[in-house]
Design a protein with these regions (language model features):
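A conserved ligand/cofactor-binding region detector
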Residues: 1-452
Length: 452
């Protein structure tokens, strides 16, 4: 135990209960019988010194792996500032009271070699032309791009690079999946694991809202292409129902001659790293719309930022740090922050139907899920199950944020029409992305935890 406690450190990557391993004692006694006496002894030592039952390793017939990590590791860290604060003040508060000295933050990073140099050589070349190639070894040198935010020639070149990547994605998806994409449209992209907390369902409800607006004659100033890319866990039924809805919307909207010149929806097949390398450099608006308090950090938000996309997001995960870095005028934030969300969960009084009844735009969008129009191209069972889930549960609180989401998304689309100012915002995002270098992350881990 003495050796383990000096060697092992715990990094928490999620607060979702489903991802914090808890193994039935009976299963472990069959699978690893040689380990159970050790686990019981570790638990007994905790019980001898701690009175708070919620922190015990063996509880309710389950072995709580995270509890073991915290008691016997020498460090506990979250992976974004907000995430770590939530661990300390909410999710792991009982442990924080026991071991405040163990808790620290290490904000995630992304590899620039993959997510800029490899996937966007045109932007990499532009950056090198402007500030030299020192940024490839020291990402903080991207700050030098701040000298060019008012340089029209640089902004024009940045727009040209983005236009080229948008054309590349258009051609790639035409070849691979037969999609007919308007490269002059706004590329609004949400690509990530399909999970209710990431709220692809809220994005889909906005698409329905926009569909109705266009049908009523309210056409956007710039055409919009909404891209989804995601996979659902094999047994995650509601996630698959959300994919089903998106595919229904793709079929309805893209084949409607009144709507498709102004709005199209594409769910890319088999979303993976190869696809991400095509989509991220082409993105104009990066959808990072998780329910505040649920995304530990996120790294897609960093990849999009690095490639000059603007974030449309909640104040969750690393979005909080992105907003601090780029300034409120260079990011589009909306929705409740983590405090009212955590309080509402604690009270257990969230009623999605009350929001549905008082917001006519929300009600119309939700009802469309089970309309004859959607059922004519989809499966009633999937659609009704999703409809009932939203109306009677909506565990990740899509409805409270919906009105602000619409308003902020419209604000982002309006900002896009000023191309020079948009390019300035994009360049500022690239300039500030150096903080999310993995070199900085790893250096902090080494200084504070590993001490190699």
């Amino acid at each position: 135990v003495s050796i383990v406690s000096k060697v092992c450190a715990y990094t928490n990557h999620t607060i979702l209960a489903e991802a914090l391993e808890k193994w039935p004692i009976g299963f472990l006694e069959k699978a690893v019988p040689q380990l159970m006496p050790i686990i019981r002894e570790l638990d007994n030592r905790v019980r001898a010194k701690v009175s708070d039952e919620s922190t015990y390793i063996i509880k309710d017939g389950l072995v709580h792996m995270a509890h073991m990590d915290i008691h016997y590791g020498y460090s506990v860290n979250g992976v974004a500032y907000l995430h770590t604060e939530i661990l300390k003040n909410s999710e792991l508060n009982n442990f924080y009271k026991l071991y405040p000295e163990k808790f620290n933050n290490k904000t995630n990073g992304i590899t620039f070699r993959r997510w800029l140099m490899s996937c966007n050589p045109e932007l990499s070349a532009m950056i090198t032309d402007l500030i030299g190639d020192g940024w490839k070894k020291d990402a903080n040198e991207l700050e030098k791009l701040g000298n060019f935010v008012n340089d029209d020639a640089v902004l024009d070149r940045l727009l040209a690079v983005k236009a080229g990547k948008k054309a590349d994605l258009k051609n790639y998806l035409k070849m691979k999946q037969g999609f007919d994409i308007d490269e002059n449209s706004i590329y609004d992209i949400q690509v990530k694991r399909l999970h209710e907390y990431k709220r692809q369902q809220m994005n889909a409800l906005y698409v329905i809202h926009k569909y109705f607006e266009i049908k009523e004659g309210k056409k956007p100033a710039t055409p919009i292409t909404v891209f989804f890319g995601a996979k659902a866990a094999p047994a995650y039924i509601i996630a698959k129902d959300i994919i089903h809805l998106i595919l229904c919307l793709q079929q309805i909207i893209n084949n409607d001659p009144e709507v498709s010149p102004y709005l199209k929806v594409f769910m890319v097949e088999n979303y993976n790293v190869t696809m991400a390398e095509k989509m991220i450099p082409a993105c104009d608006i990066s959808e990072q719309i998780s329910l505040a308090s649920k995304e530990a950090s996120g790294t897609g938000n960093m990849k999009f930022m690095l490639n000059g996309a603007l974030t449309l997001g909640t104040m969750d995960g690393a979005n909080v740090e992105i907003a601090e870095l780029v300034g409120n005028e260079n990011i589009f934030t909306f929705g409740e922050d983590s405090h009212p969300v955590i309080d509402r969960y604690a009270r257990g009084d969230y009623n999605s139907r009350s929001y549905y009844e008082k917001d006519s735009e929300l009600k119309r969008a939700v009802d469309f899920i089970v309309s004859d129009t959607v059922k004519s191209v989809g499966c009633s069972e999937n659609l009704e199950r999703l409809y009932n889930e939203l109306l009677n549960k909506d565990w990740f609180m899509t409805f409270p944020d919906f009105e602000d989401y619409i308003a902020t998304r419209e604000k982002a689309y309006a900002a896009y029409t000023d191309r020079k100012d948009w390019a300035k915002k994009a360049l500022i995002n690239i300039e500030k992305a150096g903080y999310f270098s993995p070199d900085r992350t790893i250096e902090e881990y080494n200084q504070d935890i590993w001490k190699l």
